[in-house]
């Protein structure tokens, strides 16, 4: 599943670089797992030493993956080669430094602390005039454990026992429930237009959520979201946001 983090074709990449006729000032890496190898390629096989910067939105940690083996150590090694590595949030930076502290001495953790910096993801369109239709709830997240999908379905089942006047809309998975409907959407404009018809959105993230574009997409279209008062969400919407909840599940 994590082959993109493990596979590095040194020979092919060296040929593609055409380094004898092309100069490189900056190396930008979105996969820190490859950065150590990229720096090695440039340093030992060319006469070019570009500055290295990057970004990482996903770290293989127990909170979000059940792999027997991960590429986290390669990720750390890659980030240590960077001038700066952007991450989605302060929450994610804190989590990564905590994991690094289990392995490295303080000297290296402090170096990572200076390298890793939050680079908040923006939104490409804002239209706060939502036009909700009916009692509609949107769950536009993956059906993974870290998104709280199974817990969410159980809560909707309980709600359906009490009332049958609502519809849950999903965009990435089928719930196969009498109260649910999956939307098959073919463009971003169509997706944003659909979001504007939702009454409320829900985020049930439990142990891991460094950011949620699904949430910011909906907020930018004027859709209020019920969100956990932990992970990145107080940072995203502000601690005084009225729809943060504290209950764990």
Describe the function of each predicted region.
Residues 124-126, 133-178, 188:
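Conserved catalytic-core segment of nucleotide-activated headgroup transferases in glycan assembly
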Residues 26-28, 41-63, 79, 84-86:
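Active-site proximal beta-strand in glycosyltransferases
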Residues 196-210, 223:
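Acidic donor-binding loop of glycosyltransferase active sites
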Residues 192, 215-220, 234-235:
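Short alpha-helical segment that forms part of, or immediately flanks, the ligand-binding pocket
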């Amino acid at each position: 599943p994590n082959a993109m983090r493990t596979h590095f074709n040194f020979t092919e990449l060296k040929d593609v670089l055409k380094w004898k006729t092309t100069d490189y000032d900056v190396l930008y890496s979105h996969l820190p797992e490859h950065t150590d190898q990229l720096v090695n390629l440039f340093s030992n096989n060319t006469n070019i030493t570009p500055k290295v910067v990057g970004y990482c939105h996903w770290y293989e940690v127990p909170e979000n993956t059940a792999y027997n083996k991960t590429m986290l150590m390669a990720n750390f090694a890659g980030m240590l080669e960077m001038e700066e590595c952007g991450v989605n949030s302060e929450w994610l930076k804190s989590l990564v430094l905590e994991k690094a502290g289990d392995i490295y001495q303080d000297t290296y953790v402090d170096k990572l602390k200076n390298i890793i910096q939050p680079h908040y993801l923006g939104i490409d369109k804002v239209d706060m005039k939502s036009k909700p239709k009916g009692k509609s709830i949107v769950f536009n997240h993956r059906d993974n454990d870290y998104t709280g999908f199974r817990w969410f379905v159980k809560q909707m089942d309980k709600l359906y026992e009490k009332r049958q006047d609502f519809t849950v809309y999903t965009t990435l998975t089928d719930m196969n429930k009498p109260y649910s409907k999956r939307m098959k959407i073919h463009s971003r404009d169509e997706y944003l237009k659909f979001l504007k018809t939702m009454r409320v959105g829900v985020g049930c993230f439990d142990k891991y959520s460094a950011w949620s574009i699904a949430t910011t997409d909906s907020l930018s279209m004027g859709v209020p979201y019920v969100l956990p008062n932990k992970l990145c969400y107080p940072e995203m919407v502000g601690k005084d946001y009225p729809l943060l909840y504290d209950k764990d599940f």
